[in-house]
Amino acid sequence: MALQIPSLLLSAAVVVLMVLSSPRTEGGNSERHFVAQLKGECYFTNGTQRIRSVNRYIYNREEWVRFDSDVGEYRAVTELGRPDAEYWNSQPEILERTRAEVDTVCRHNYEGVETHTSLRRLEQPNVAISLSRTEALNHHNTLVCSVTDFYPAKIKVRWFRNGQEETVGVSSTQLIRNGDWTFQVLVMLEMTPHQGEVYTCHVEHPSLKSPITVEWRAQSESARSKMLSGIGGCVLGVIFLGLGLFIRHRSQKGPRGPPPAGLLQ
């Protein structure tokens, strides 16, 4: 499927090239440089559910006229663009063709590109929970759910406390673009943790067959210390058990060396 280019942009490009290639005035000693940009832009929301087409006409880095499909007609951005906007708006054929570019150009190109390129790319998010301040229970705090490295941008992140969705005190950053086309976002929950409460960050994304849920449990410092001590004790126990088995195994084999001299006679 070939990509389409807005027809009026193409026509305008030919005119600009003719003007820029005109011979210089005889006797002129210095070159004059002109830059004309003709930009056709397509904006998509939820795939092709909503499409916006924008054509921009720029001369020496200054936009002079624009067509926006949400407006439905050409609008002059500067006085330089007023004659062109008025003329193009007076031509039903031009106006109808440009309005149709939402489908003939934007939708057409989206469907072609989606079939063959990274628009079908899916990257699963990584999810982690952190506490903004290390404080005791029953003090105001903020839980941060970090959702990173996902594609496409569409994502839904929710907070739950003991199985009930939290809507008060929830805020988030804007989507942050990574250099590899993936995204990340932080979703915060203002809360006051109490002993035994379970907070869950619930993430839904097109790349996932089922949502990702990550839990954070409210614990006192003493409970956390006991848990860490228990884990440390288990690790040390496994190490000493392994060391003891190794020593016992070596001692059962006995020392290696030449047989007693009497056995050789």
From Swiss-Prot:
Any one annotated GO CC term: multivesicular body
Protein topology in the membrane: Single-pass type I membrane protein
Matches recorded under PROSITE patterns: IG_LIKE, IG_MHC
Record carries keyword Ribonucleoprotein: no
Cysteine pairings via disulfide bonds: C42-C106, C145-C201
Cytoplasmic-side segments: 248-265
Residue ranges crossing the lipid bilayer per the database entry: 228-247
UniProt entry tagged with the keyword Glycosyltransferase: no
GO molecular function: peptide antigen binding
Compartmental location: Membrane
Region called Beta-2, residue ranges: 123-217
InterPro entries noted in UniProt: Ig-like_dom, Ig-like_dom_sf, Ig-like_fold, Ig/MHC_CS, Ig_C1-set, MHC/Immunoglobulin, MHC_I/II-like_Ag-recog, MHC_II_a/b_N
UniProt entry keywords in alphabetical sequence: Adaptive immunity, Disulfide bond, Glycoprotein, Immunity, Membrane, MHC II, Signal, Transmembrane, Transmembrane helix, Ubl conjugation
Annotated signal peptide: 1-27
Post-translational modification note: Ubiquitinated in immature dendritic cells leading to down-regulation of MHC class II.
Extracellular side: 28-227
Domain Ig-like C1-type: 125-213
Organism domain of life: Eukaryota
Coiled coil residues, start to end: none
Biological process (GO), any one: antigen processing and presentation
Region (Beta-1): 28-122
Annotated glycosylation sites: N46
Family recorded in the similarity comment: Belongs to the MHC class II family.
Descriptive protein name: H-2 class II histocompatibility antigen, A-Q beta chain
Species: Mus musculus (Mouse)
Species classification: Eukaryota, Metazoa, Chordata, Craniata, Vertebrata
